[in-house]
């Protein structure tokens, strides 16, 4: 097991070509939000764009579309009820933040994992669907990223006594299923089974609602930009934590909001680039 250090991250992070255009940086697809829970979609979308995706489409319920259009005009919008789910024309997919777990959500989840041939991240309510529809696990494409917090992890894989037990299970499941697991926590684990990293950035300010939604957006953005899924997960977790550390210069861990973290992502990228010179 390795530490996710700044020096290592600098070896895998690619600075942007000054002459590039939006088409060079991928088209991310996020499926997020539901009635009364659109904050998760807004947070994931903002984080995705701040992490560098060239284009972003967010699939939301029709009645909630105005929330996203006002909050993040840079994102394109698709309506959940009429979207054709021709998903493989996108560069990467992140799904689950506050989507709900009703029959319609299960239908969408099943449709996506059955047809997906592009990088995929499963989070939040999509993980909760998976925990109650275990037969769907075998349909998950190889290389898919799962991003559970400890309670979601236990719902998926059974109760564990402590973090060490969860880490052991995560490593074994990742290897067995050929997937990537990001086990979120104080020291987040990123594992492909064959190789595992412990994150070295972040602080207690991330211990509040919206943090996981932002991480979903960030990792999905990196996948859309062409990073291999395991690399995207490493970059996403590290940048997410580094931005929180930078935000802590202006906020306390008690007062920090995930919007403070997202607004600190530019400084996080600059820190990586400046320190690598």
Q: Predicted segments — roles?
A:
Residues 1-119, 128-143, 150, 154-277:
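Small-residue (G/A/S/T)-rich helix-start motifs and N-terminal tracts that mark the onset
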């Amino acid at each position: 097991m390795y530490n996710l250090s700044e020096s290592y991250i600098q070896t895998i992070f690619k600075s942007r070509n000054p002459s590039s255009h939006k088409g060079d940086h991928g088209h991310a697809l996020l499926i997020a939000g539901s009635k009364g829970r659109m904050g998760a979609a807004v947070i994931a979308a903002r984080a995705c764009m701040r992490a560098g995706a060239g284009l972003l489409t967010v699939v939301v319920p029709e009645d909630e579309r105005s929330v996203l259009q006002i909050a993040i005009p840079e994102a394109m919008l698709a309506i959940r009820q009429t979207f054709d789910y021709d998903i493989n024309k996108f560069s990467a997919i992140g799904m689950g933040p506050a989507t709900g777990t009703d029959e319609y959500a299960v239908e969408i989840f099943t449709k996506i994992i059955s047809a997906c041939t592009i990088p995929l991240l499963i989070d939040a309510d999509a993980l909760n669907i998976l925990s109650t529809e275990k037969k769907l696990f075998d349909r998950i494409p190889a290389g898919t990223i799962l991003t559970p917090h400890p309670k979601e992890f236990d719902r998926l894989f059974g109760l564990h006594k402590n973090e060490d037990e969860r880490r052991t299970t995560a490593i074994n499941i990742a290897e067995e299923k050929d997937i990537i697991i990001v086990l979120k926590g104080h020291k987040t684990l990123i594992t492909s089974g064959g190789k595992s990293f412990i994150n070295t950035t972040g602080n207690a300010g991330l211990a509040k609602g919206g943090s996981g939604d932002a991480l979903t957006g960030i990792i999905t953005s990196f996948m859309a930009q062409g990073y291999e899924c395991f690399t995207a997960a490493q970059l996403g977790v590290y940048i997410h934590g580094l931005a929180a550390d930078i935000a802590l210069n202006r906020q306390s861990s008690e007062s920090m909001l995930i919007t403070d973290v997202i607004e600190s992502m530019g400084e996080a990228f600059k820190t990586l680039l400046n320190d690598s010179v």
